[in-house]
């Protein structure tokens, strides 16, 4: 009876089998999983590129800060290859001649700047330290006709700075 009614109405549709429905769902789930995986990888690589760009930016700013400070240096002191103190005209926080220090401790490179070059050149106040960059390795050497020095006071012709296995040589004055 039902068959005759459906034939009269012109209905020739019999429906989907379970296998067809399962195959369709599997194809749709594969497409969505591919889209999700590609989005996840793109996000991961973008985050990695952003982190690398920030690291390179901080290294470039540090390089520029060191170059400016050493180009205007009037007096320089290096302690154990980990601290660099200067009397320089290349201040970044204050104008004019300043007392400046680059101190590496706890995996961070700190900047200390004081507007008046008075007192001991290697004195700094802990609460006035400014974080410059996170560096695993920071070493400073004075280079003169006698070689490289970890401890130095005066004005050498060159200063060598090692940042995370990269070596930079700066001409002083």
UniProtKB/Swiss-Prot annotation:
Family matches, as InterPro entries: N_methyl_site, Pilin-like
Lipid bilayer topology: Single-pass membrane protein
Modified residues (N-methylphenylalanine): 16
UniProt key word Membrane: yes
Propeptide feature ranges: 1-15
Transmembrane intervals: 16-37
Main location: membrane
PROSITE patterns with a match to the protein in the record: PROKAR_NTER_METHYL
Subcellular location: Membrane
Entries under Pfam families matching the protein: N_methyl (PF07963)
GO cellular component, one term: membrane
Keyword terms of this UniProt record: Membrane, Methylation, Transmembrane, Transmembrane helix
Protein name: Uncharacterized protein aq_2118
Native species: Aquifex aeolicus (strain VF5)
